[in-house]
Amino acid sequence: MKRRDFLKNSLAASALVSLSCAATAQEHASQKAPVQEYYELRAYRLKSAATEPMLDEFLSKAALPAFNRLGIKPVGVFGEIQPKDPPTVFVLIPYANPAQYAGAVHHVAADPDYLKAGAAYLGTPKSNPVYDRIDSWFMLAFAGMPKIVLPAYSKERKPRLFEMRTYESYSESKALKKVAMFNNGEIDAMHEVGLAPIFYGQALTGPNLPHLTYMTSAENEEAHKKHWDAFGKHPKWDQLKNDPQYADTVSKITKWFLTPKPYSQI
């Protein structure tokens, strides 16, 4: 073999090996990193408490079954433990990717079973609307908890409560730092003390950006308070809250204490 041909063949072989190694590394990386879900969080701002039964009927008989037929589940539906007047109903919908989120609107609207089951709600007259407005946030799950996790009492449909929190930040960079703080140990600490988080989401669209939203759970109020007390004493939390890189990441905290609707899948 001529030296020129030998070098040519050697370079080609090296390139193939490099490509193979890169592909293998990429494959391993994709196997190690679970795909992060996307979430839509809706807040139905009802006209009055009198319209809540119609919304419940629509969600339980029409909307949730339609989502489930598209493989979108579990869908959570919650009311406030101490509802305001008029009340707000929260709906949490998980999506595999943004395309599923965008397509769901059209697929659901063309679903004959959905249209039939939701006819009363969908045909509500202008003179008697069910809600004032629907607020909606589209969120990306955190890398530290890429999918919804259901505790045993949710799966078994036992009595349970949820606390949902939104952490607003004064800048985009500080909002990302707070997400990193969760991913770098805060989520683990919450699991370890029994706070039983359901989801963590970085808001991509919606009101009051930038912010993140997450939900914890417990079997009752006493257990929930006990878990938060334990979290406050956790060494990992003590380390994180005193780390200068995470200073001033949160400018406003909003909390909701929620109870699941009887038909909620969370």
Please identify what each model-predicted range represents.
Residues 255, 259-265:
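Short, low-complexity, Pro/Ser/Thr/Gly-rich segments in the mature regions of secreted, periplasmic
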Residues 59-60, 183:
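Short alpha-helical elements within RNA-binding folds
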Residues 45-55, 61-69, 74-155, 171, ...:
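Hydrophobic, ordered structural segments
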